[in-house]
Every structure is written in structure tokens, then in C-alpha cells.
UniProtKB/Swiss-Prot annotation:
Entry annotated with the keyword Acetylation: no
Family: Belongs to the class-I aminoacyl-tRNA synthetase family. ValS type 1 subfamily.
Record GO terms (molecular function): aminoacyl-tRNA deacylase activity; ATP binding; valine-tRNA ligase activity
Residues engaged in binding ATP: K571
Gene (name only): valS
Organism: Yersinia pseudotuberculosis serotype I (strain IP32953)
Name of the featured protein: Valine--tRNA ligase
UniProt entry tagged with the keyword Ubl conjugation: no
EC number per UniProt: 6.1.1.9
Length: 965
């Protein structure tokens, strides 16, 4: 017993009066961690179960998406741990190249007025490590608050020495196999940060722009079918005209097909460029002629490759017009196929100034046909905040096609399963059309590319410079410089499942826990992370027979968490909810400061302030971790986006209270009493037999839900059993026994109370760990359990022998009868405590048996002064009636209600509902409201209308019943 958490008072006879998560959660977590309960049990004869947390950015702090995914992961880990498996849940953080570099750059700019260039590369990187030491642990501290049962001693960081070695090893081996190469290709270029960025870091914004229609004169006296001596091309980026190397028309287009193979003379530069036939030109769109700029547009780049067009780069890395262009062939080699001259008037211009200058020149030459307003999608860098340029640069690439083939087969043959299954199609569509992966970034923070150059520009790849010199016989007199670039962070996180277990060493951890069991991830990174992990892992990890090993057997995909109106949570919308604010509570002032302080766009602050004050007039109450986890589990319908609902959170906080109070009731009736654990005769009441049957059916359904990743169903099953069956019915049904049962009956009921509550706590533990451990520590002694923690107790198993079908059907009938009486009380406005006379008319043999065997139960729970079975043919007095299976329930009304008063009350209630129905119908009939209001608001009004109509119908039926008395 020495391991009982110190804050649990062992001598106190019962639980504290009120459930206070703030007092129990943190001390309990510290106790669990200190005792080492989160570590694998080390029993390699047992099946192992392993989850790797998707590494959050080291710069980050916990948001709702993390809380959601980590609740699911912890629920799975606790569930599997309780089944005796050797479980490892491993956490870590990602070095987050660009994000971390920017955080530290902003910090030194604000505090010291310096840039990273003032520091120099090595000193700046030292500065980042220093920052990581001070601030990098925020997210892991917050993860502990969620109750995450992570083995913290195995925490990893993507720039750890071990992981850095694995990254080098992978790079060197892929390069040896010709699966990594350096090439000149088009990338997303951020001119502000001066680096290539991934598609995930590009934010496409809708904007109003222009479409310029420009005339390109035909060469050699050629004419169009309409007799014109020029083609008109439409473009949204006139500045790129300087880099055009062709004009495409559709080969089927009757207007232009005779011109294919002829040339136009490019205005401003006088370059002769070919007219090509290509499907890329759409006859229906614009003029049907498309200018082709292979060095500055992703589609044009593909067209250029198909037709072997040279590529002309006209921009510097800052996004300005170059003083002379760079001309390359389709392989990225320099060529003199075209002149590299750029007219002097455009040289050095910033790209948007160049746009204006080019348009002005076309107008001056009489070659501007027209300008039309145009809605367009513009790519912005999500961190630099400037327009992204497709840019021709030298980068390192992974040749993905051979890796993708194996990774596709792993999903096709079921080695990896997606939950929900529809995400497999998304995976296939991307993998079957996969492009080579640009893995280099022009940053300082990250894994530096293990490649060196000599003065002639030869490239050598190796694990370090010494290896490069040794393998290539390069003496000390040969000067080498290392590649300045670093690797895309997705490259190192792509090795996450095996590098964190010690690869390339063949460690015991790798043998025990790889492949891992499941990965829980958002669908937005299915390509960036999931697909790349599958490709890289299967290439490097092989089983003892040399067969490629998958990184995980199941991919559980989550949707996004949105606000209550279905909007994406973002700082600029001011609708972000911090999960820890729901756990600990936050005042309105602090919440406003959080939402409006340090805003990138301060002009939005007032709108956000108003919205927040309306939504949270008193701030947010503390709800505790368990209520947050329960809500997240309950909302986790597979793969769909979730609209966050504060009312659900309150409901699950109430659930925790209900469980606490029910446990107090059980303890008050069992502590210090004979609960049958020492033998002695036990008689189980119908209610005892019924709750055991209900509970076993609950275990079965709950396990099925957990085994199929239906956490929403599991949470619903747990809620329904605990609240409705156990608390509302069973605890009430024990009261007649407690008041007047025999010793054997008392023993039976106490024994059942303890048995069901103790197992229910184990059932609920994976979702709500804190409250269940706290209560279990009190209940375990009554069951004679000496173990230290619920975490390592066996998970409840379904026992068919406990399912007494007769008890289930008998008690269901009794419940229906009691509900019938309660409904009549409510409809007739009769006080709940007023004893009633009740009669049963036309009862069949089954109903009669049930009444005779359980009369005291029924009378006690329905608050009856008498319960009479009417003889056959006896109609009984004037009564309000309800049908139950095999009988009719009668409550004589004589002396119970004043008919006139009651009818008057009902008429007033109907009138009130009529007014409300009219108000809502008016609102929904207003087209402006329906069109402008958020979808969720309109849906709420429609639900309210349906509820009012239903309530009105019920009142009308009651009026008819009373009028007939």
C-alpha cells in the first residue's frame, strides 16, 4: 500500500463531498510518472503495442488539434496497457526548421537589434539551441496536463545526435542508390525568407486582380484564320513575358492549328519563339492562346519539358528582375539557345513594379488589347507572408517513384489499414502521380546536407568530411566546402518510427516495438508525413527475411477541430480555444488579452473582442482534464471535422460529478459493512441480476467500439450505462433493499454495488484516467484488491454467464411501468412526492407475475400508496391511462386535479409556444437571414422550430385527455 498516491487520505471513510479536478489531477500525474507506470512492462513474451506521437514543433504550444489526437492516443495506450500488452508511447518534438529560425530571428531583432547575419551561422545556431533549452519544453509540459501516459525517459528531438546520425545515414545510402540527386527544377520560392518551401507552407488566397490581353506579332508574314497578323495571349503576370519561350494553342483549335510550328516575335525583347500544339491550351478559355514561361510557372514548366523548350529565369532570389537572364535547357544545363539580354528599363525592378512597367510598355507600343477584372488565387508563404514565386533553382531531390511503388502495395495488400477507409483513395491518388521530392531548404537551422564541393564544383556525399576525403582520396591540399542548405524537416520526421528506436543500430527497442501499432494524424499531412514515412521506412527497415517493414499497421485519420460555427480556428479570426483554458478556467480579461494581444492584424481586434464577450461573458469555467478528454472522445466520429461545443464540455463535466456522487453513495452504503467478500450467504435481487447483465452487455459493446476506433460510440456507451442505467436506475433500485432487505439480500446488493462500480472504473479509465484512479483507490479495498494503480489492472472482459435474459426483460417492464406513472404525473401537473393509487387493467399472466414478484420495488420507486391488479372485465374508475407491455396503467383522477385550472394552464402554454413558433418562422422566412447567417445558426433555429412544434402537439394531446375526464 506504500504506493498509494500521498494526496489520497486512506483513513477518511468516504470521498470528499465535491469533485475537484484541480486538487486531484496534477499530484496524481506526478505520482504515476514517479512510479514508472508509463514505461513498457518489459515482458517480451507479451504482445507489444507502440504509438509514436507525431512530433509537434518545438516552438509550439498545445492546441485543440494536439489535445484531440493525444486524447485518442492515450485512450488507446491505456486500453492496451490494461490488456497486459508491453506498451510504449513515445513522444518527441520536431526542430521545425523555418518556424524555429524565425522565432529566434524575431527575438534577436527585438532584444538586440541584430540579424542572423550579424551573428554568423555557427553562433546563430548556438543561439537557437540556447532558446530551445529555455523555451522548447512548453509543449511537453502541457502534454503532461492532458494525462498523457508517455514514457518521458524516451523523449526524442529530431536534432538529437542519434536522430542526426540516422538522417545522414539515410541521405548517404539513398544517394549511393541514385535515389537522391541534385537538379535544377521549379520550386515554391519565398523571396522574403529566400528559401524553397513545401506545398504545405503555401497558403492560397482568393483575390481580385486583372487579366491582361497582349498582342504577340506573328513572324514571317503569317496570319490567323481571321486574317490578323498577331496572336492575343491572356496573362495575370505580364512581368513574366520577359521569360517566355513559346506560345501554346490547342492542336484541335480551328483558329490556330495551321499556325503550329510557326513563330511569334516576343514584344519588348524581340525574341522569336515557337507556336506549339498542346492540350494545356484550353479552346474555351480566354483567347485560346497561352504564353509559356517554363522558368516561372509550374504548368508551363511541364509544357516546356514536353516540347524541349529552353527555360529563361528572369528573377533574382529576392524577386527582382535580373540584369541579365539565365538560359537553361530542359535538363537545367546552361545554353545559348536564346540571348540572355533583358531591356535596361526593367533591370533591377521589384517584380510588381516590373509588372506595371511591362504593361505600360505594351500600351505605348499599341500591343495592349484589353484589361479585364479577374478573380484569381494567389499563393502566399504562410510564414513570410509574401507572394510565392515558382523559381528555377538548384535543389536536392528524392527520386520517389521506386519508393512509392512499394508503399502503394503495402496499403493495397492490407499491411497498412486506413481508418476511415476512404482515406486510402486520397493516398493512392497522390502516390500514383507522385513527383520527385525537393528536400533542400535555404535555411541555417536543420540537418545540414552531408555533401561537399571542391573548387571545380564536383560534389561528394558522405557521413562527414573525413569520410569524403578518405573515400575519394582527397588530400588536405584539396579545399572542400560543405553544402550550405539544410534538409526539409519532413525528411527527418519521415524516419520517426525507426530512428527514434535507435536505428541504424539494431537495438532491442527496434526489435520489440517496430513496426509500431498505429499512427494518429490529421488528414492534412497524409502526403507530407504519412506517405513519406511509409516510403522511407519500407526502404530501410527489413524483417529477418528481408521483407520491407511497414512503419505502422494502422493509420487513424482525424478531422480538424473547428469552432462552434464550423469556422477553422485561427489567431486572425480570434476563435482559438486553448485546451488548458478549458481545464483550468480563464477570466474574460485574460481571454481577451490572449486573443487580441500581439496580433499581426490589430484592426481585427475590436471584432474579436465583441465576439469573445458575447460568447464567454464570464470567461471560461474550469472543467478539469477528464471532462475535456471525454468531450474530445465523444466528438471523435471517424475522419470528420468537429465543431467544438462548450455545452458538450459542460455536460461531460456534469457526468464526472455524477460518477463522483454515485461513488460516494456506493461507499456510504458499503464501507465498514459486510459486502460478501468473506463468504456468507448472498441473495441477488432482480435489480442486482439486471445491472450485472446490463454491465456485461456494455463491456461487450464498449470493447467492440474501442477495437474499431469508434471512440465516439465508446464514450456514448459509457455515458449511457453510467448515467442512465447505473446512477438513475440501479442506485434507486437498491434503496428498497437497503431500507428493508434481509442480511443475505443486503450482502448481495452491497457486493453487486462494489463489483459493478470497481469494474466500471476500469472500463472508463482509458478515457477519464484521473477521476477513475481517485475513486478506485477507495473502492479497491472493499473488493480485497492490494494492487497499487488502476492503470495496470486488467481491462473488464465480457462474461456471457452474467447476462440473465429474464432479469433484463422483467426489469425493463418495471422501468416502463414506473416511467408511465412518472409521465402521467408530469402531464397532469401532479407533485412528484404525492403518493398515488395505481391500478393495472387487462394484465396478462406475465405482467401479473412481474407485479406480484416486485410490488415493493414498483411502489417504492413510483411513489405509490397502492398498486392493484383489476379483475378481468373490471373497467375501474375515470382515469388517465398509459399502455405498457401486456397491461394498461390507470391513475384515477378524482380529487387529484382541478380540471378547469389545468385546462387554463395548458391553454396559456400553447399560446406561448404559438408566439415562439411565429417568431422563428418569421426569421427563417427572411431570405437575408438564411443567406447571411452561419449554417450552424440557421440549423439551430430549424431544430428549435421542430422542438416547439413537438411540444405544442404534446400539450394539445394533454388538453384532450383532461377534457375527456
Amino acid at each position: 500500500m506504500e504506493n498509494t498516491p500521498s494526496h489520497i487520505n486512506k483513513t477518511e471513510p468516504s470521498l470528499d463531498k465535491t469533485y475537484s479536478p484541480q486538487e486531484i489531477e496534477q499530484p496524481l500525474y506526478e505520482h504515476w510518472e514517479k512510479q514508472g507506470y508509463f514505461k513498457p512492462n518489459g515482458d517480451t513474451s507479451k504482445e507489444s503495442y507502440c504509438i509514436m506521437i507525431p512530433p509537434p514543433n518545438v516552438t509550439g504550444s498545445l492546441h485543440m488539434g494536439h489535445a484531440f489526437q493525444q486524447t485518442i492516443m492515450d485512450t488507446l495506450i491505456r486500453y492496451q496497457r490494461m490488456q497486459g500488452k508491453n506498451t510504449l508511447w513515445q513522444a518527441g518534438t520536431d526542430h521545425a526548421g523555418i518556424a524555429t529560425q524565425m522565432v529566434v530571428e524575431r527575438k534577436i531583432a527585438a532584444e538586440e537589434g541584430k540579424t542572423r547575419h550579424d551573428y554568423g551561422r555557427d553562433a546563430f545556431i548556438d543561439k537557437i539551441w540556447e532558446w530551445k533549452g529555455e523555451s522548447g519544453g512548453t509543449i511537453t509540459r502541457q502534454m503532461r496536463r492532458l494525462g498523457n501516459s508517455v514514457d518521458w525517459e524516451r523523449e526524442r528531438f529530431t536534432m538529437d545526435e542519434g536522430l542526426s546520425n540516422a538522417v545522414k545515414e539515410v541521405f548517404v545510402r539513398l544517394h549511393k542508390e541514385d535515389l537522391i540527386y541534385r537538379g535544377k527544377r521549379l520550386v515554391n520560392w519565398d523571396p522574403k525568407l529566400r528559401t524553397a518551401i513545401s506545398d504545405l507552407e503555401v497558403e492560397n488566397r482568393e483575390s481580385k486582380g486583372s487579366m491582361w490581353h497582349l498582342r504577340y506579332p506573328l513572324a514571317d508574314g503569317a496570319k490567323t484564320a481571321e486574317g490578323k497578323d498577331y496572336l492575343v495571349v491572356a496573362t495575370t503576370r505580364p512581368e513574366t513575358v520577359l521569360g517566355d519561350t513559346g506560345v501554346a494553342v490547342n492542336p484541335e483549335d480551328p483558329r490556330y492549328k495551321d499556325l503550329i510550328g510557326k513563330e511569334v516575335i516576343l514584344p519588348l525583347v524581340g525574341r522569336r519563339i515557337p507556336i506549339l500544339g498542346d492540350e494545356h491550351a484550353d479552346m474555351e478559355k480566354g483567347t485560346g492562346c497561352v504564353k509559356i514561361t517554363p522558368a516561372h510557372d509550374f504548368n508551363d514548366y511541364e509544357v516546356g519539358k514536353r516540347h524541349a523548350l529552353p527555360m529563361i529565369n528572369i528573377l533574382t532570389f529576392d524577386g527582382d528582375i535580373r540584369s541579365e537572364a539565365e538560359v537553361f535547357d530542359t535538363h537545367g544545363e546552361a545554353t545559348d539557345a536564346f540571348s540572355n539580354a533583358i531591356p535596361a528599363q526593367f533591370q533591377g525592378l521589384e517584380r510588381f513594379a516590373a509588372r506595371k512597367a511591362v504593361v505600360a510598355e505594351f500600351e505605348k507600343l499599341g500591343l495592349l488589347e484589353e484589361v479585364k477584372p479577374h478573380d484569381l488565387t494567389v499563393p502566399y508563404g504562410d510564414r513570410g507572408g509574401v507572394v510565392i514565386e515558382p523559381m528555377l533553382t538548384d535543389q536536392w531531390y528524392v527520386r520517389t517513384a521506386p519508393l512509392a511503388k512499394v508503399a502503394i502495395e503495402a496499403v493495397e495488400n492490407g499491411e497498412i489499414q486506413f481508418v476511415p477507409k476512404q482515406y486510402e483513395n486520397m493516398y493512392y491518388s497522390w502516390m500514383r502521380d507522385i513527383q520527385d521530392w525537393c528536400i533542400s531548404r535555404q535555411l541555417w537551422w536543420g540537418h545540414r546536407i552531408p555533401a561537399w564541393y571542391d573548387e571545380q564544383g564536383n560534389v561528394y556525399v558522405g557521413r562527414d568530411e573525413a569520410e569524403v576525403r578518405r573515400d575519394n582520396n582527397l588530400g588536405a591540399e584539396v579545399a572542400l566546402r560543405q553544402d550550405e542548405d539544410v534538409l526539409d524537416t519532413w525528411f527527418s520526421s519521415g524516419l520517426w518510427t525507426f530512428s527514434t528506436l535507435g536505428w541504424p543500430e539494431q537495438t532491442d527497442a527496434l526489435k520489440t516495438f517496430h513496426p509500431t501499432s498505429v499512427v494518429v494524424s490529421g488528414f492534412d499531412i497524409i502526403f507530407f508525413w504519412i506517405a513519406r514515412m511509409i516510403m522511407l521506412t519500407m526502404h530501410f527497415m527489413k524483417d529477418e527475411n528481408g521483407k520491407p517493414q511497414v512503419p505502422f499497421k494502422t493509420v487513424y485519420m482525424t478531422g480538424l477541430i473547428r469552432d462552434d460555427e464550423g469556422q477553422k480556428m485561427s489567431k486572425s479570426k480570434g476563435n482559438v480555444i486553448d485546451p488548458l483554458d478549458m481545464v483550468d478556467g480563464i477570466s474574460l480579461e485574460a481571454l481577451l488579452e490572449k486573443r487580441t494581444g500581439n496580433m499581426m492584424q490589430p484592426q481585427l481586434a475590436e471584432k474579436i473582442r465583441k465576439r469573445t464577450e458575447k460568447q464567454f461573458p464570464n470567461g471560461i469555467e474550469p472543467h478539469g482534464t477528464d471532462a475535456l478528454r471525454f468531450t474530445l472522445a465523444a466528438l471523435a466520429s471517424t475522419g470528420r471535422d468537429i465543431n467544438w461545443d462548450m455545452k458538450r464540455l459542460e455536460g461531460y463535466r456534469n457526468f464526472c460529478n455524477k460518477l463522483w456522487n454515485a461513488s460516494r453513495f456506493v461507499l456510504m452504503n458499503t464501507e465498514g459493512q459486510d459486502c460478501g467478500q468473506n463468504g456468507g450467504e448472498m441473495v441477488l435481487s432482480l435489480a442486482d441480476r439486471w445491472i450485472l447483465a446490463e454491465f456485461n452487455q456494455t463491456i461487450k459493446a464498449y470493447r467492440e467500439a474501442m477495437d474499431t476506433y469508434r471512440f465516439d460510440l465508446a464514450a456514448g456507451i459509457l455515458y449511457e450505462f453510467t448515467w442512465n442505467q447505473f446512477c438513475d436506475w440501479y442506485l434507486e433500485l437498491t434503496k428498497p433493499v437497503m431500507n428493508s432487505g434481509s442480511e443475505a439480500e443486503l450482502r448481495g446488493t452491497r457486493h453487486t454495488l462494489i463489483q459493478v462500480l470497481e469494474a466500471l472504473l476500469r472500463l472508463a479509465h482509458p478515457i477519464i484516467p484521473y477521476i477513475t484512479e481517485t475513486i478506485w483507490q477507495r473502492v479497491k479495498n472493499l473488493k480485497g484488491i492490494t494492487a497499487d494503480t488502476i492503470m495496470l489492472q486488467p481491462f473488464p472482459e465480457y462474461d456471457a454467464s452474467q447476462v440473465d435474459e429474464q432479469a433484463l426483460s422483467d426489469l425493463e417492464w418495471i422501468k416502463q411501468t414506473i416511467i408511465a406513472v412518472r409521465n402521467i404525473r408530469a402531464e397532469m401537473n401532479i407533485a412528484p412526492g404525492k403518493p398515488l393509487e395505481v391500478m393495472l387493467r387487462g394484465a396478462n399472466a406475465q405482467a401479473q407475475r412481474r407485479v406480484l414478484e416486485n410490488q415493493s420495488f414498483i411502489q417504492s420507486l413510483a411513489r405509490l400508496s397502492s398498486l392493484t391488479l383489476l379483475a378481468e372485465g373490471d373497467k375501474g374508475p375515470v382515469s388517465v391511462t398509459k399502455l405498457v407491455e401486456g397491461a394498461e396503467v390507470l391513475i384515477p383522477m378524482a380529487g387529484l386535479i382541478d380540471k378547469a385550472t389545468e385546462l387554463d394552464r395548458l391553454a396559456k402554454e400553447v399560446a406561448k409556444l404559438d408566439a415562439e413558433i411565429e417568431r422563428i418562422e418569421g426569421k427563417l422566412g427572411n431570405e437575408g437571414f438564411v443567406a447571411r447567417a452561419p449554417e450552424a445558426v440557421v440549423a439551430k433555429e430549424r431544430e428549435r422550430l421542430a422542438a416547439c412544434a413537438e411540444a405544442k402537439q404534446k400539450l394539445i394531446e394533454q388538453q384532450a385527455t383532461i377534457a375527456a375526464l
